[in-house]
Swiss-Prot record:
PROSITE patterns: ENOLASE. InterPro entries: Enolase, Enolase-like_C_sf, Enolase-like_N, Enolase_C, Enolase_CS, Enolase_N. This is Enolase. Mg(2+) binds at residues 246, 289, 316. The lineage of its organism: Bacteria, Thermotogati, Thermotogota, Thermotogae, Thermotogales. It is an enzyme of class 4 (lyase). It is found in: Cytoplasm; Secreted; Cell surface. Keywords: Cytoplasm, Glycolysis, Lyase, Magnesium, Metal-binding, Secreted. Signal peptide: none annotated. Catalyzes the reversible conversion of 2-phosphoglycerate (2-PG) into phosphoenolpyruvate (PEP). It is essential for the degradation of carbohydrates via glycolysis. Its EC number is 4.2.1.11. Disulfide bonds: none annotated. One of its GO terms (biological process) is glycolytic process. The active site is at residues 209, 341.
Length: 432
C-alpha cells in the first residue's frame, strides 16, 4: 500500500496579536492542492525556567520590545525552504526537521514560537486535506474522551495585581455526565461568584485568563468564597464540583533563603506542606499544581508520598512538557500528573510524546492554555485526541477562553453516542 504523500508547497508566517495585545506568530502551511492549515501560538506570563524559548525582537520602538518579526523571518527564510517538498502527513519527520534545523536544546535559535506555529499549521493542513476534524487526525479512531475542565475563576500571583500568593483558584465540575452539563455548571458558578464579589464590594473586572482578582484576606478566603459560589449556584461541593489550585510556587520562593512567602509569612518546604495538608483536610481540593518551586524535587516527592493517593499533584514548571524532566519525575515519583503546554516544548510530536509517557506511567495529563492566548482552538482538539481527560483553558469569560469550550461542545455533539465524559473517573492516578 502506498503511503499518502501530499507535498507542502508553501510555508509563511505573520505577526498577529494575542489576547493581551502582544505580538505572536501565526503560520500558514499550503499543500499541493491548495489546502491551507493555519495556527497561532500562545505565550505565557509565568514561565518555567526550563521552557523552550520564544524569540522576541527586543526593539523598544515596536510593541515595547515584544515584536516577533525575527521569528516570522525565521519561518519565512529558514524553515520554509527546509519544509517545502516534504510530506504533510509525516508529522514526526516534519518536527524532527524543525528541531534539527534549530539545533539548540531550548529552541532558542529559531524560536519555539516560530517552530511551534509551523508544527501546528502542518498538522492542521493535513487534517484539512483529509476532511478530518483535528482531534480525529491527531488521535485516530479512538479519540472520544471529553475533558473535565479546570476553570480558573479567581486569579492571584503573577496573573493578578492583588494580595493572593497562589496563582489560580479553580472550580472543577467533575460530577456530571457530559461536558455540556459541566460547562453549564461552571458558567452558573462563575456568574454567582461575580455577584458574591460585587455584593461584598470587590471589583469584578477580569484578568488575563478571565477570572476575578479580588483583594482578599488570605488564600483560604478565596477557597471559602468558591465554596459559597458553588453552593449558592445550587451545586454540591465534593460531589459535583471540586476545587483545584495552581500555586505556581516558584513565584513566591526566595532562592537565596530557601523559603516560601505565603500569607505574609516565611515558610520552609516542610511548613508549606503542612499548610497545604490543612487546606486539603478542610476543603474539597482535588488537584494542586506546582505546590513547590521548580527545583524543589524533594518536596514534590515527599508531598506526593503523603497526599498523592487523594489529590492530583501536577507538575507544570517542574516538567515544562519535557520528556527528559518528566522521566526524572516518574523515576522519583515526584507527582502523579503533568500539565501539558505545547509552547513549553515547541512541537506537536514532542507534546504527544510527553502525554504518552505520562499515561503509560499511570500519570494524568492536563492539556493547558497560556495566559496570552488567541482564537486558535488547537488545544481543545488536542485534549480529545489524547483522551487526556482534563483541560485547563481559563474562566467563563473572554472569547479566547470560550473559543476552546465552544469547540469542545461541537466535538461532543459530533461524537454523539460515543462521546465519553469520565468525570471523577478521569482522576485515575488517585484513589477516588
Amino acid at each position: 500500500m502506498e503511503i499518502v504523500y501530499v507535498e507542502i508547497v508553501d510555508v509563511r508566517a505573520r505577526e498577529v496579536l494575542d489576547s493581551r495585545g502582544n505580538p505572536t506568530v501565526e503560520a500558514e502551511v499550503v499543500l499541493e492542492d491548495g489546502t491551507v492549515g493555519r495556527a497561532i501560538v500562545p505565550s505565557g506570563a509565568s514561565t518555567g525556567k526550563f521552557e523552550a524559548l520564544e524569540i522576541r525582537d527586543k526593539d523598544k520602538k515596536r510593541y515595547h520590545g515584544k515584536g516577533v518579526l525575527k521569528a516570522v523571518e525565521n519561518v519565512n527564510e529558514t524553515i520554509a525552504p527546509a519544509l517545502i517538498g516534504m510530506n504533510a502527513f509525516d508529522q514526526p519527520l516534519v518536527d524532527k526537521t524543525l528541531i534539527e534545523l534549530d539545533g539548540t536544546e531550548n529552541k532558542s535559535k529559531l524560536g519555539a514560537n516560530a517552530i511551534l506555529a509551523v508544527s501546528m499549521a502542518v498538522a492542521r493542513a493535513a487534517a484539512n486535506y483529509l476532511g478530518l476534524p483535528m482531534y480525529k487526525y491527531l488521535g485516530g479512531v479512538n479519540a472520544k474522551v471529553l475533558p473535565v475542565p479546570l476553570m480558573n475563576v479567581i486569579n492571584g500571583g503573577q496573573h493578578a495585581d492583588n494580595n493572593l500568593d497562589l496563582q489560580e483558584f479553580m472550580i472543577v465540575p467533575a460530577g456530571f455526565d457530559s461536558f455540556k452539563e459541566a460547562l453549564r455548571a461552571g458558567a452558573e458558578i462563575f456568574h454567582t461568584l461575580k455577584k458574591i464579589l460585587h455584593d461584598s464590594g470587590h471589583v469584578t473586572a477580569v484578568g488575563d485568563e478571565g477570572g476575578f482578582a479580588p483583594n482578599l484576606s488570605s488564600n483560604e478566603e478565596a477557597i471559602k468564597i468558591l465554596i459559597e459560589a458553588i453552593e449558592e449556584a445550587g451545586y454540591k461541593p465534593s460531589e459535583q464540583v471540586f476545587i483545584a489550585l495552581d500555586c505556581a510556587a516558584s513565584s513566591f520562593y526566595d532562592e537565596e533563603k530557601g523559603v516560601y512567602f505565603v500569607d505574609g509569612e516565611e515558610k520552609s518546604s516542610e511548613v508549606l506542606m503542612g499548610y497545604y495538608e490543612e487546606l486539603i483536610a478542610k476543603y474539597p481540593i482535588i488537584s494542586i499544581e506546582d505546590p513547590f518551586a521548580e527545583e524543589d524535587w524533594d518536596a514534590f516527592v515527599e508531598f506526593t508520598k503523603r497526599v498523592g493517593n487523594k489529590v492530583q499533584i501536577v507538575g507544570d514548571d517542574l516538567y515544562v512538557t519535557n520528556v527528559k524532566r518528566l522521566s526524572k519525575g516518574i523515576e522519583l515519583k515526584a507527582t502523579n500528573s503533568i500539565l501539558i503546554k505545547l509552547n513549553q516544548i515547541g512541537t506537536v510530536t514532542e507534546t504527544l510524546d510527553a502525554v504518552e509517557l505520562a499515561q503509560k506511567n499511570n500519570m494524568t495529563a492536563i492539556i493547558s492554555h497560556r495566559s496570552g492566548e488567541s482564537e486558535d482552538t488547537f488545544i481543545a482538539d488536542l485534549a480529545v485526541a489524547t483522551n487526556a481527560g482534563f483541560i485547563k483553558t481559563g474562566s467563563l469569560s473572554r472569547s479566547e477562553r470560550i473559543a476552546k469550550y465552544n469547540q469542545l461542545l461541537r466535538i461532543e455533539e459530533e461524537l454523539g453516542k460515543v462521546a465519553e465524559f469520565r468525570g471523577l473517573s478521569s482522576f485515575y492516578s488517585i484513589k477516588r
